[in-house]
Structure formats: structure tokens, C-alpha cells
Amino acid sequence: MSAITVGVVVFPGSNCDHDTAYALASFAGVKPVMLWHNNHDLQGAQAIVLPGGFSYGDYLRAGAIARFSPLMKEVVEFARKGYPVLGICNGFQVLLESGLLEGALSRNRDKKFLCCQTTITPVNCSTRFTEDYHQGEVLRIPIAHGEGNYFAPPEVLESLQEHNQIAFQYCNAQGEVTVEANPNGSLLNIAGIVNRAGNVLGLMPHPERASDAALGSVDGRLLFESLFRSLTGV
């Protein structure tokens, strides 16, 4: 079986691109390729990851400039054809700015940058990113962001719920979705959402930082396993 090629987009200011590539390369049969933002060539990628960082220094607002990168035209078309696209932290912000996902991410509730371990629970376990998870389980996955406060108008929130597009919610250690467990003020404790087709996922927690036992958690690893299983049919 030929290797699965996964493109990792590199913007000026990305700082989790190599972490993400390292996590991807830890899976047998997976070949990460770095995709510079100023190109148009996806290098035969079967999936795309927009990693965390501070693309273009987060000027204007997080992800606002990155959406205009030449490569993003290809990523948007790639996603609209039904191929999988994952946005992590700043990558989630870019997906929102690009219109591939609905809503917006604003400054954290307390206006402080947060870098800490969080617990989240899977809500929709039927997407190609989440099939290896189980509803109600508690995942330990860290966050590191200043603008992770998810906001959307009431009609968008209703639509997300109606179409099962909330992928992950912040929860406590018992798996309860509570105000106290919400680190940044996100509406409905939203930690990640998918598009209606289920092929585009954006989340603020960093699964690549929870994919190796040496990092204290492997709970993020199943997200990548789910994706690769969907690509290989195994």
C-alpha cells in the first residue's frame, strides 16, 4: 500500500508545523509534506492540516491575513471537493476566516493567553476525524491560544446543533459540560466544529501535543488514526 500523503501548510508565523508533521510521521505509512503558503501545489496530498501558530503575526485578527495566501485558494477548493481538511488552533481560525466553517473566534474571556491542559469530550463521533472516539469519554488535550472564544449568532448555533456539527466540547474530569470547565468563554463550551459534510474540522486544542506518551497524553492520537483509517478504508 502506498504512503498516505498529508500536507501541512506553513504560513509565516506558524510554529506548530513541525510538531504536527512529527505526530503525523509517527504513523506507519503516512508521509507529511510541508506546503509553503505562497505556492499553489498541494503535492498530491490526500489530506491537509492547517497547524497552530501566529500566521502573519495575527495582525488585524487571527487568521485574517492567512486566508488570502495563494495556497488557501487550493485548500478551499480541495475541501469543497470533499477531501479532509483539519485546522488546529490558528488553523481553526484560518478555516473560519476562509468561510469553510461558520462562526468566529474572539479574545479569551479573561483577555489572557491560555497555555494549559484541558479536558474535552467528543460530541459527534461519526466524522472521518472522530470515528475512533466514543461519546462521553474524557480526553486530555492541551490548549495554547489568546483568541479561542468561539462565537456565532443564535441561528448558526442552532444549525450546528441541529446538524450535529459540534465535534468537541470542553468538559470537566467527569465528562460534564459545565461553565467552570470552559477555559475561554466559548459559546456552548465549543472546542471544535465540523462542516455539514463532515470533511472539515477545526478545533482549538492541540491533538499533536497529545499524541506521544512522553508528552503526558495520547488522547489526540485517535483523531489522526480516525482520519487515516478513513483514507485507507482499513
Curated annotation (Swiss-Prot):
Annotated Glutamine amidotransferase type-1 domain residues: 6-234
Catalytic site: C89 (nucleophile), H206, E208
Hydrolase keyword on record: yes
Matches recorded under InterPro entries: Class_I_gatase-like, PRibForGlyAmidine_synth_PurQ
Main localization (coarse): cytoplasm
Pathway connected to this protein: Purine metabolism; IMP biosynthesis via de novo pathway; 5-amino-1-(5-phospho-D-ribosyl)imidazole from N(2)-formyl-N(1)-(5-phospho-D-ribosyl)glycinamide: step 1/2
GO cellular component: cytoplasm
Keyword entries, A-Z: ATP-binding, Cytoplasm, Glutamine amidotransferase, Hydrolase, Ligase, Nucleotide-binding, Purine biosynthesis
Coiled coil: none
Catalytic activity reported: N(2)-formyl-N(1)-(5-phospho-beta-D-ribosyl)glycinamide + L-glutamine + ATP + H2O = 2-formamido-N(1)-(5-O-phospho-beta-D-ribosyl)acetamidine + L-glutamate + ADP + phosphate + H(+); L-glutamine + H2O = L-glutamate + NH4(+)
Biological processes, Gene Ontology terms: 'de novo' IMP biosynthetic process
GO molecular function, one term: glutaminase activity
Compartments where found: Cytoplasm
EC number, UniProt record: 6.3.5.3, 3.5.1.2
NCBIfam families the UniProt entry points to: FGAM_synth_I (TIGR01737), PRK03619.1 (NF002957)
Annotated HAMAP family: PurQ
Function: Part of the phosphoribosylformylglycinamidine synthase complex involved in the purines biosynthetic pathway. Catalyzes the ATP-dependent conversion of formylglycinamide ribonucleotide (FGAR) and glutamine to yield formylglycinamidine ribonucleotide (FGAM) and glutamate. The FGAM synthase complex is composed of three subunits. PurQ produces an ammonia molecule by converting glutamine to glutamate. PurL transfers the ammonia molecule to FGAR to form FGAM in an ATP-dependent manner.
Subunit structure: Part of the FGAM synthase complex composed of 1 PurL, 1 PurQ and 2 PurS subunits.
Protein name: Phosphoribosylformylglycinamidine synthase subunit PurQ
Species this chain originates from: Chlorobium chlorochromatii (strain CaD3)
